Amino acid sequence: MKVYVLLVFLTLCSAKPLFHPSYLTLKNLMLKDMEDEGDSDADNSLFPTREPINPFFPFDLFSTCPFGCQCYSRVVHCSDLGLSSVPSNIPFDTRMVDLQNNKIKEIKENDFKGLTSLYALILNNNKLTKIHPKAFLTTKKLRRLYLSHNQLSEIPLNLPKSLAELRIHDNKVKKIQKATFKGMNALHVLEMSANPLDNNGIEPGAFEGVTVFHIRIAEAKLTSIPKELPSTLLELHLDYNKISVVELEDFKRYKDLQRLGLGNNRITDIENGSLANIPRVREIHLENNKLKKVPSGLQELKYLQIIFLHSNSITKVGVNDFCPTVPKMKKSLYSAISLSNNPVKYWEVQPATFRCVLSRMSVQLGNFRK
């Protein structure tokens, strides 16, 4: 018996400390995020080196922490607790608050009062229907706000001017008001897919003065490409909408665009010359549409490397549809051309058609099924 007890004791003493994987993963992600962001604050680090983390005690056991939550290195982790409201006693020096997967219905005026160092706020997958106009009055350093999978009917007004990334995917937003992003010069990423937004819901001037680089409005009710999005766009994703035609003037405003997503729409025609307005584009998604031919102008896009055209109604591929006809024209080699699941007879496609691809593995043909 004594030997058994001794063995158990030795086993417990030699056991490694228990870490929850999500804590360390979350910390690493936020560290990388802060490095990428290049925050110019005097206190640049989310996990300051002057407060080293003891691997045997990953949580700060002595500071104030909301009941049921876990606090460590200026991160307050309160997800998956069934909370119906934002907890009190969040430390004032908190940099990140994780409240996802709860049952919070409302953000009140003082829920985040005094959190002047808050950098990221995660409220995904709650039941939010209302956010007080003054809820973010003191969070002047907030850079990332995640509100996806809630029941918000509009984008909150009076968001912090410091915000760089807003994700409000899968809500009930039908309108983007003119004043929504006023003064938000730091906003670079806007993700608002899976909202019942149509073209009339984007008020004229809604994006005036903002320098957004990435916008995703997929799974919405758009019937055409919005023409008044920021001219600074590098990525535009409008997949899973109801767009039927790409008109000549649709991309005239977006000359710096590098990635374009128009997959899973109803596009039957791309007007000649329309793609010439995005000369810097590198990747185009047009899969799962109703195109009957390869869009014209691809051979003139010297930076284009990826083009997805699978699952359309393309019956013919010309020898000059993808590659330049001018021998001296320098063009990036294609790393992916997807033409699979089209009624084109692949044995009729001339080998010279793909003379500007990286390798034959870069081309996908065949597998058409009626």
Curated annotation (Swiss-Prot):
Record GO biological process: bone mineralization; negative regulation of tooth mineralization; negative regulation of transforming growth factor beta receptor signaling pathway
Sorted UniProt keywords: Disulfide bond, Extracellular matrix, Glycoprotein, Leucine-rich repeat, Repeat, Secreted, Signal
Ranges where the LRRNT domain occurs: 56-92
Signal peptide residues on this chain, from the entry's feature table: 1-15
Database matches in SMART domains: LRR_TYP, LRRNT
Glycosylation positions in this chain: S45, N272
Cysteines paired by S-S bonds: C65-C71, C69-C78, C323-C356
Statement: the UniProt record of this protein carries the keyword Secreted: yes
Localization of this protein: Secreted, Extracellular space, Extracellular matrix
Statement: the UniProt record of this protein carries the keyword Amino-acid biosynthesis: no
Domain of life of the native organism: Eukaryota
GO molecular function annotations of the record: calcium ion binding
Entry's Gene Ontology cellular component terms: extracellular matrix; extracellular space
Main location: secreted
Residue ranges of LRR repeats: 93-114, 117-138, 141-163, 164-183, 186-209, 232-253, 256-277, 280-302, 303-324, 332-354, 355-370
Similarity comment: family membership: Belongs to the small leucine-rich proteoglycan (SLRP) family. SLRP class I subfamily.
PANTHER family: AGAP008170-PA, ASPORIN
Descriptive protein name: Asporin
Organism expressing this protein natively: Bos taurus
